[in-house]
């Protein structure tokens, strides 16, 4: 089906080799950043980490803020330049609470108060601290009844 794109194939092989070589360092960095973010968010009263604290993807934080509608929180975060989601990537925009969160034992109200944050090794500690501060302020604002 034609001539193979040898330069692209070679480039892909080089990129995969580099990604594989960087995987241990990138994973360690993500774990450190995830821990930093998780600690800061769990300092907010009425906040709960969903799932096992250790057995999760290195760049995944799934957290519930009691009494805060995630969709409203997402609007405030978007205005502040913070990217987050109220559910899995494949269910973004769904009205029903996440069946996965319900299976983990969350109530429908808790599932609708849950935020998913992802990060990678390119994120900085400063970005994590900024995101945590913005999320903290937005959660407090919503709990105080200010929209």
Mark where each language-model region is.
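Predominant activation on well-ordered alpha-helical scaffold segments within soluble catalytic domains
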Residues: 6-17, 38, 42, 74, ...
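Conserved C-terminal alpha-helix-loop-beta "cap" of PLP-dependent enzymes
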Residues: 59-116
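Conserved PLP-dependent catalytic core of the aminotransferase class-I/II
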Residues: 20-73, 79
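Glycine- and other small-residue-rich loops at beta-strand/loop junctions that grip anionic moieties
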Residues: 1, 26, 62, 89, ...
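Structural signal for hydrophobic packing residues in well-ordered secondary-structure cores
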Residues: 16-23, 41, 45, 81, ...
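PLP-dependent aminotransferase class I/II
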Residues: 1-19, 26-33
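PLP-dependent enzyme catalytic core of the Aspartate aminotransferase-like
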Residues: 92, 96-147
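Glycine-rich beta-alpha junction loops
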Residues: 5, 16, 37, 65-67, ...
């Amino acid at each position: 089906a034609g001539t193979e794109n040898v330069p692209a194939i070679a480039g892909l092989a080089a990129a995969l080799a580099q990604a594989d070589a960087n995987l241990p360092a990138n994973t360690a960095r993500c774990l450190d950043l995830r821990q930093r973010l998780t600690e800061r968010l769990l300092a907010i009263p009425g906040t709960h980490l969903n799932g096992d604290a250790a057995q999760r993807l290195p760049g995944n934080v799934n957290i519930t803020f009691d009494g805060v509608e995630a969709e409203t929180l997402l609007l405030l975060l978007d205005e502040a330049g913070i990217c987050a989601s109220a559910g899995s990537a494949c269910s973004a925009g769904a009205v029903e609470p996440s069946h996965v969160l319900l299976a983990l034992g969350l109530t429908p109200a808790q599932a609708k108060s849950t935020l998913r944050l992802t990060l990678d090794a390119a994120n900085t500690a400063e970005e994590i601290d900024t995101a945590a501060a913005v999320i903290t302020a937005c959660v407090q604002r919503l709990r105080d009844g200010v929209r």
